[in-house]
């Protein structure tokens, strides 16, 4: 059974937001509330891939990590796609700042993706290069590329805002997945000084307070975009934001279903 109620609620909420003629600061707050209140898979506590971890075996979680790596690998290209099409200098500078951190500005010049690839392969046994992805992951990547190659700058900024707004809770969920895999493997923990540990700390950290990298990215992006959004651009911003949130929410649902369907693929080998 699909959870259609959340999508109907999103649709109704979006209609109300688009009809309210809000100032940018109020608009951003309403969009933030959409994530927490309407999109079940974008919250760590209700994401089905997190809530079902206890029922999955090591190979199931490895599959999930491999599939998510496809989005991680593509994300940096989404920023580059946006940068090519952006005409608003302040937003371009913020995208460049985020890209510099992804390329290792805060991790001793080691790109985040390289930390991910090394850690996943050598510490968690997950290969992320030259792999095939499921249809639902390929559909997500195609959908996101289409969104971030749109030349409407307000729409594009809505997409960028959503990518950053969802990042902290999303990566806290990914951290839970990675730690669950490590525990399934050998009962151990991911050390902070391990390659995977460094990768995690490059994205989320609850200590010290206020030092969460993804929260900083979102605050910077929200501020930069605000300089360019006027009332006539509100609705395009909302459309871009909702497009990304809906794509990610539905992917988490679909990939969780995919894990279970793989477990029930009982065809004998030839």
Feature names for model-found ranges:
Residues 7-21, 27-58, 73-76:
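Short alpha-helical hairpin
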């Amino acid at each position: 059974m699909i959870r259609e109620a959340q999508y109907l609620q999103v649709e109704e909420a979006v209609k109300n937001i688009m009809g309210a003629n809000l100032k940018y600061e109020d608009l951003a707050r309403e969009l933030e509330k959409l994530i927490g209140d309407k999109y079940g898979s974008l919250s760590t506590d209700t994401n089905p891939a997190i809530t079902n971890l206890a029922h999955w075996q090591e190979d199931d979680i490895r599959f999930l990590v491999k599939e998510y790596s496809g989005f991680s690998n593509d994300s940096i290209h989404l920023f580059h796609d946006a940068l090519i099409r952006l005409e608003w200098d302040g937003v371009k500078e913020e995208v460049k700042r985020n890209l510099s951190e992804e390329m290792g500005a805060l991790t001793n010049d080691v790109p985040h993706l390289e930390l991910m690839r090394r850690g996943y392969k050598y510490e968690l046994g997950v290969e992320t290069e030259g792999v095939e992805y499921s249809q639902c992951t390929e559909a997500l990547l195609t959908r996101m590329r289409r969104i971030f190659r749109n030349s409407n700058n307000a729409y594009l900024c809505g997409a960028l805002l959503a990518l950053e707004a969802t990042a902290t809770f999303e990566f806290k969920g990914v951290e839970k997945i990675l730690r669950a895999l490590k525990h399934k493997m050998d009962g151990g923990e991911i050390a902070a000084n391990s390659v995977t540990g460094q990768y995690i700390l490059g994205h989320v950290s609850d200590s010290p307070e206020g030092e969460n990298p993804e929260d900083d990215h979102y605050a910077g992006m929200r501020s930069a975009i605000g300089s360019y959004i006027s009332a006539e651009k509100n609705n395009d911003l909302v459309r871009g934001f909702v497009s990304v949130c809906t794509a990610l929410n539905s992917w988490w649902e679909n990939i969780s279903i995919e894990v279970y369907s793989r477990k029930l693929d009982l065809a004998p080998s030839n």
